[in-house]
From Swiss-Prot:
It is found in: Cell inner membrane. It comes from Rickettsia conorii (strain ATCC VR-613 / Malish 7). Its main location: membrane. Residues 54-267 are periplasmic. Residues 1-32 are cytoplasmic. Disulfide bonds: none annotated. GO terms for biological process: cell septum assembly; FtsZ-dependent cytokinesis. This is Cell division protein FtsQ. The keyword Cell membrane applies. Keywords: Cell cycle, Cell division, Cell inner membrane, Cell membrane, Membrane, Transmembrane, Transmembrane helix.
Length: 267
């Protein structure tokens, strides 16, 4: 009985030692893997975010571009959509790449940011259409008025953004004058567009005190609009025009600031 007991104890001790050894080996393996991962992360960070290995990085990048170019991944076509007022040479200049250039070498975010510096461009999307095409989608600002301020003229959009000083291609746009006129021009133009005949007779809109509008009509007629809810006043003036009772009555001023009582001054 004593011999069997001694033999069992030896077997248990051997098993315990084997388990302990496996655990140690397992821990060593995990530590080794963790160490390799940390080393790899450090290497990647140094490679990407620092100047270390700069020569290797440049060499690898150059070889990748050369290889992919040989496989047909090179710039052959540029598709531009949404272009109206921005000329094509300006866009291609920002692209800064010749035909046959490695298509993967193009920095799309940089191209997009540089295009957005053009005041005509409100938004732009740039993408690669592999293997050989760059696609550019422009969303241009739409001029809605010519703003006169401090003896200068600007094209402005519905948000009041100054687009350009070149107003010559847009002689049909409404002239708005005064401080803040650019900001509120969008609302005024939107309302006037409901009455095309009246809008065609409006030569300018003057913003007064940054509060309200005076419309200068052809024939030297001045329309004083109220500060708020001027839609009814516009509707009234349009009705006069349609009834042929506006431009043949020697009107000088139509004061519509008080919606309960309109005042008319004649020449």
């Amino acid at each position: 009985m004593r011999k069997k007991t001694s033999s069992n104890k030896k077997k248990q001790t051997k098993k315990t030692n084997n388990i302990s050894l496996r655990r140690k080996l397992g821990l060593m393996y995990k530590k080794a893997i963790l160490g390799l991962k940390i080393a790899l992360i450090i290497f990647v960070c140094l490679f990407v975010f620092t100047k270390y290995f700069a020569g290797i990085k440049t060499y690898l990048t150059t070889n990748i571009y050369q290889t992919t170019t040989k496989l047909g991944f090179k710039l052959e076509n540029v598709i531009i959509e949404g272009q109206q007022n921005v000329d094509e040479p300006t866009i291609l200049k920002v692209l800064n790449a010749n035909k046959g250039s490695p298509i993967f070498a193009l920095k799309l975010d940089e191209i997009r940011n540089n295009l957005k510096k053009n005041k005509w461009i409100k938004e732009v999307y740039v993408s690669r259409r592999l293997p050989n095409t760059v696609y550019i989608k422009l969303f241009e600002r739409e001029p809605i008025a010519i703003w006169q301020i401090n003896n200068q003229l600007f094209l402005v959009d519905e948000e009041g953004y100054e687009i350009s000083k070149n107003i010559q291609p847009f002689p049909h746009l409404l002239h708005v004058v005064g401080e803040g006129a650019n900001i509120y021009a969008g609302t005024l133009v939107l309302e006037l567009q409901k009455y095309p005949a009246l809008m065609n007779k409006t030569s300018a809109a003057v913003r007064l005190g940054d509060r309200r509008w005076d419309l200068n009509l052809k024939g030297n007629i001045s329309i004083k609009l109220p500060e708020k809810e001027f839609e009814e006043a516009l509707k009234y003036v349009d009705a006069l025009n349609k009834a042929n009772k506006l431009f043949n009555q020697n009107y000088k001023v139509l004061d519509l600031r008080d919606k309960n009582k309109y005042y008319i001054e004649k020449y």
